[in-house]
């Protein structure tokens, strides 16, 4: 923060210990897209793909979430998809959904720090730590949500439902190039997903298929156009199902 950031300005409320940076009202805030999905479904690969496709035309940054490590951030930095300083890691220390839905302050701090340091930004991608089929972002953190499943998880995954599958702005069925090896019918899997999503978009994606990558990038561009025009309204896919985790090794 600038040296004078803590000084109270006339007409501003007193600033407490949890002070946040906010984009000036006359500057558009970056579009924030959350990327969620179970462990191993290719979320980091999706982020890397989007950075490669869009960084030449948009000013971008990335925030990753892991429980105890910065593994995803290190993967993206090593891939060279963005300047390393534009990739921030949040170590949640708790269940992945906590930091993207229940208490988003750590992620908001990371996003706002990036906007202050490198703004104005066009796009910030926020990757959730791997969780289950019900993980979703709070609309207070993400303007739009992409949920990733993959063919290696089984051809019936989309039929299992959950708010991420049924209500995210975009459902990605990832790693379609692996379908022959795991005996999954991608066409049937897409059809199941479309039935579950009642008209919301579904994208079959492979990092080896330029056409599917182009469709993914075009989806982001379309959301950004709506965001800039003020016509995009963040929606909440719904809360996670009641559940519990044990992190004490018992």
Swiss-Prot record:
Entry keyword Endoplasmic reticulum: no
Renumbered residue ranges of the record's region Disordered: 1-24, 230-250
Entry keyword set: Chaperone, Cytoplasm, GTP-binding, Nickel insertion, Nucleotide-binding
One GO process term, biological-process aspect: urea catabolic process
Localization per record: Cytoplasm
Comp. bias intervals (Low complexity): 7-17
GO molecular function, one term: GTPase activity
SUPFAM superfamilies the UniProt entry points to: P-loop containing nucleoside triphosphate hydrolases
InterPro entries (UniProt xref): CobW/HypB/UreG_nucleotide-bd, P-loop_NTPase, UreG
Major subcellular site: cytoplasm
Entry annotated with the keyword GTP-binding: yes
A UniProt-annotated Pfam family: cobW
GO cellular component: cytoplasm
Residues the record lists as binding GTP: 37-44
Subunit structure: Homodimer. UreD, UreF and UreG form a complex that acts as a GTP-hydrolysis-dependent molecular chaperone, activating the urease apoprotein by helping to assemble the nickel containing metallocenter of UreC. The UreE protein probably delivers the nickel.
Record-stated family: Belongs to the SIMIBI class G3E GTPase family. UreG subfamily.
Function noted in UniProt: Facilitates the functional incorporation of the urease nickel metallocenter. This process requires GTP hydrolysis, probably effectuated by UreG.
Family annotation (HAMAP family): UreG
Protein name, UniProt field: Urease accessory protein UreG 3
Lineage of origin: Bacteria, Bacillati, Actinomycetota, Actinomycetes, Kitasatosporales
């Amino acid at each position: 923060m600038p040296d004078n950031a803590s000084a109270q300005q006339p007409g501003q409320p007193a600033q407490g210990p949890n002070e946040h940076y906010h984009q000036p009202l006359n500057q558009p805030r970056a579009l924030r897209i959350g990327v969620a999905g179970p462990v191993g479904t290719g979320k980091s690969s999706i982020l890397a793909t989007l950075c490669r496709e869009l960084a030449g035309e948009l000013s971008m940054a990335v925030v990753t979430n892991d429980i105890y490590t910065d593994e995803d951030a290190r993967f993206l930095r090593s891939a060279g998809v963005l300047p390393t300083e534009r990739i921030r890691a949040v170590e949640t220390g708790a269940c992945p959904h906590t930091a993207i839905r229940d208490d988003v302050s750590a992620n908001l701090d990371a996003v706002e720090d990036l906007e202050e340091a490198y703004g104005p930004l066009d796009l910030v991608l926020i990757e959730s730590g791997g969780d289950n089929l019900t993980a979703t972002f709070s609309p207070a953190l993400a303007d739009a949500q992409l949920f990733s499943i993959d063919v290696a998880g089984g051809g019936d995954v989309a039929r299992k439902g959950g708010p991420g599958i049924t209500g995210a702005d975009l459902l990605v069925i990832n790693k379609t190039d692996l379908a022959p090896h795991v005996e999954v019918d991608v066409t049937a899997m897409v059809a199941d997903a479309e039935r579950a999503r009642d008209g919301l978009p579904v994208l079959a994606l492979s990092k080896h298929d330029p056409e599917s990558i182009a469709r993914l990038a075009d989806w982001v561009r379309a959301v950004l156009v709506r965001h800039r025009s003020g016509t995009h309204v963040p929606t909440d896919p719904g809360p996670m199902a009641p559940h519990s985790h044990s992190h004490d090794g018992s």
